[in-house]
Amino acid sequence: MTEEEIRQLAADYMGYFTRGAAAQDRQFKAVEMLWRLCRDDAGTGFRVIWVAVNLVDADNMKALSFLGTGPLGDLINFHGQDVTGLLIEAARENANFCVALSCVGRSMVSEGAWKDLTGALPSIRAHHSGLNS
């Protein structure tokens, strides 16, 4: 996928959740396409999620939680500990990503991946909170 296609998919995915009942076929397809990317192409799936996280206002907890319970959970479910290091680094770099990653549910991921997340996220959240004080 080109960077433009990644940006468009991220915008369409977020549009599915921000437009509600007004979502169009394009937004519905974006949800399925991102699920497939998370399953089949972890690198591109991550890029789309990264772009989507950066489209969201920091106070939009609903949108960030959709990213965590949706594609981030899918990415970890399909690729486990192969991607947790990358995701933890992204959470360190970006407070929105940290919030979204914190929304991944225990039942969605393997024991090893959950251990990685719960070991790293508390200190990352504390770091981001300290920056905002």
Feature locations, PLM:
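Alpha-helical solenoid scaffolds in large eukaryotic transport, assembly, and signaling factors
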Residues: 1-118
